[in-house]
């Protein structure tokens, strides 16, 4: 359809469906319509078959409405793929996507298609052609993408659930930013027939809901999983290191999960882990992905390397599928998308093969960690949703922080669910639960079991609006430091790191907190983090002897022997009687004479 229209015009069409009944649709031709929060691109009705006569049970999704991202095929309709040029250059679909058909056949009614990022490639939710959907949770901030409209449709209560596609966070990010549930299933668990591909080795059909029971019911239809008895998790593993660099306090994120777990299953189920260290030890192919190595030690964190692998795979596979169309049409793109697709990209076949090895090894590692009844807990996103029109998504640091967390499930192919936990500083807060590849039904069951208690604990953690703090930030920081010291004495290194991190969040210019956390990192063998913390401590206090000694120790373990000797010597300048610094400096001096 190639007709011109006035800014407020819409087109109503009645077409045959080929599923059941008929559908009526209306295309939004401009971004002027905002009564639907800008979520919908098409209004339509895909009607389910008539309900069976009693005493037969009704269809499992009867009375539920849903929307779909405009990346799924609908018979007789051209999906936009987030860009008007795509619709202009493609023919209408000859059939409806398998996932959509399955849901309609199960009794749900599809009422529309929703806005996606251009070419479904971004995670911001912004679209310069069809408009950026309004985030109902924080209207002055982006909704997250790529499945922005689908998330907004659920968050604004227009539908009971919606479908999106998650490649590198396309469902998980908007769920986190809009404060709703978002499920990314195991890779390959749901049919991709009738979906425009972004990156075939990363793409999954995902879905949003507010109600965990609805999320689960939809999952049972899409996953076609056989019935099994519901099982409680045997282990809930907190990835403590992933929570340490958030701007949200731990008592609003990981501590909420810990308290809910203790209440439901008991303390014995809980386990803490440094996930980066685990990945570094289990995914050997990551070493080949590092461009900066010293004595075999990675200078880039394992999660950042995973993010690089994910970006390379996504870009490589996207170009393999769509490069001809891109070169002919030359579509006008949002800067955040253009920056990723137009920057110079060269990757060898060897690098792609190594990326595939990383993917295989990571899946084995995560499956081995979680087994059949384990759950890994991580933050969904590293930062709150940026303000509309902000430049954060153009920042390499922002992208790296976000994609590092998102790469875990994308690369391993494991299933992940975003769980909202209220608000902090007026922005939605969420965590994510990950289960092994193929553990989708178990994860949906676990979410349903935990959801109410998680919300209760999140409410308890949120301060009352009428309450006033009677303890200063500095005092609270000191309390956290003392708790960290006690945990360190008890040889609970990861727990100590958590408390020192809390102290740093409350008072970020105290050298002692960084130096103490560095010592705990040394005990865990996390030498890069220890070196970084010591350097920060020294920047605040250039006479901090312990920081110099601890940095020297970290550098020695990393193989930076000259720098280590310099640190030990400077510690002796500050404290000539320091026997440990003297012996360390002498040992290295003799070694390299």
Curated annotation (Swiss-Prot):
Q: Which loops or segments lie on the Chloroplast intermembrane side of the membrane, by the record?
A: 1-4, 166-403
Q: Give a Gene Ontology cellular component term annotated to this protein.
A: chloroplast outer membrane
Where does the secretion signal sit in this chain?
none
* Highest taxon above the source species: Eukaryota
- Give the transmembrane region(s): 5-25, 145-165, 404-424
- Compartment annotation: Plastid, Chloroplast outer membrane
Its domain comment says:
The TPR region (477-578) is not required for assembly into the Toc complex, but interacts with TOC34 only while transferring the preprotein from HSP90 to the Toc core translocon.
> Subunit info?
Part of the Toc complex and of the intermembrane space complex. Interacts with TOC12, TIC22 and with the cytosolic domain of TOC34 in a GTP dependent manner. Interacts (via TPR region) with HSP90 and with HSP70 with low efficiency.
Q: What is this protein called?
A: Translocon at the outer membrane of chloroplasts 64
Q: Which organism is it from?
A: Pisum sativum (Garden pea)
């Amino acid at each position: 359809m190639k007709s011109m229209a006035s800014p407020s015009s819409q087109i109503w069409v009645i077409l045959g469906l080929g599923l059941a009944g008929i559908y009526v649709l209306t295309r939004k031709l401009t971004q002027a319509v905002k009564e639907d929060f800008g979520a919908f691109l098409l209004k339509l009705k895909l009607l389910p078959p008539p309900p069976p006569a009693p005493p037969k049970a009704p269809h499992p999704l009867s009375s539920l409405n849903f929307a779909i991202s405009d990346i799924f095929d609908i018979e007789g309709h051209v999906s936009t793929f987030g860009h008007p040029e795509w619709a202009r250059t493609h023919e209408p679909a000859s059939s409806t996507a398998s996932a959509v058909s399955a849901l309609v056949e199960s009794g749900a009614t599809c009422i529309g298609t929703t806005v996606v990022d251009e070419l479904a490639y971004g995670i911001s939710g912004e679209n310069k052609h069809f408009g950026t959907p309004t985030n109902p949770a924080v209207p002055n901030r982006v909704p997250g993408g790529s499945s922005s409209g689908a998330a907004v449709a659920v968050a604004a209560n227009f539908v009971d659930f919606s479908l999106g596609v998650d490649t590198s966070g396309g469902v998980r990010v908007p769920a986190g930013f809009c404060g709703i549930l978002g499920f990314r299933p195991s890779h390959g668990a749901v049919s991709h027939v009738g979906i425009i591909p972004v990156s075939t080795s990363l793409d999954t059909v995902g879905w949003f809901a507010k109600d965990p029971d609805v999320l689960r019911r939809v999952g049972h239809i899409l996953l076609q999983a056989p019935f099994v008895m519901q099982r409680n998790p045997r282990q809930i593993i907190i990835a403590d290191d992933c929570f340490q660099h958030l701007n949200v306090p731990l008592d609003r994120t990981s501590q909420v999960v810990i308290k809910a777990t203790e209440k439901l299953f008991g303390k014995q189920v809980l386990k803490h882990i440094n996930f980066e260290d685990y990945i570094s030890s289990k995914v050997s192919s990551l070493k080949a992905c590092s461009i900066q190595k010293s004595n075999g030690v990675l200078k880039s964190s394992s999660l950042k390397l995973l993010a690089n692998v994910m970006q390379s795979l996504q870009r490589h596979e996207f170009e393999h599928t769509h490069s001809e169309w891109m070169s002919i049409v030359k579509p006008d793109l949002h800067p955040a998308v253009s920056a990723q697709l137009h920057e110079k990209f060269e990757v060898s076949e060897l690098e792609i093969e190594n990326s595939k090895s990383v993917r295989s090894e990571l899946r084995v590692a995560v499956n081995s960690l979680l087994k059949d009844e384990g759950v890994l807990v991580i933050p969904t996103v590293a930062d709150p949703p940026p303000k509309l029109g902000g430049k954060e998504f153009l920042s390499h640091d922002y992208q790296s922080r976000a994609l590092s967390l998102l790469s875990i499930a994308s690369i391993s192919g494991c299933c992940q669910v975003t769980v909202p936990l209220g608000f902090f500083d007026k922005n939605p807060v969420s965590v994510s639960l990950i289960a092994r590849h193929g553990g989708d039904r178990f994860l949906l069951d676990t979410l349903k079991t935990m959801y109410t208690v998680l919300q209760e604990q999140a409410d308890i953690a949120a301060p009352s609006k009428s309450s006033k703090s009677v303890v200063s930030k500095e005092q609270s920081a000191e309390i956290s430091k003392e708790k960290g010291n006690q945990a360190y004495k008890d040889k609970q290194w990861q727990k100590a790191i958590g408390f020192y991190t809390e102290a740093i969040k409350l008072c970020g210019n105290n050298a002692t907190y960084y130096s103490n956390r560095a010592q705990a990192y040394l005990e865990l063998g996390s030498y890069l983090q220890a070196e970084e913390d010591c350097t920060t401590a020294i920047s605040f206090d250039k006479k901090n002897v312990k920081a110099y000694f601890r940095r020297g120790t970290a550098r020695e373990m990393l193989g930076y022997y000259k720098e280590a000797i310099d640190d030990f010597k400077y510690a002796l300048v500050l404290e000539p009687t320091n026997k440990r610094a003297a012996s360390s400096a002498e040992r290295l001096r003799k070694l390299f004479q």
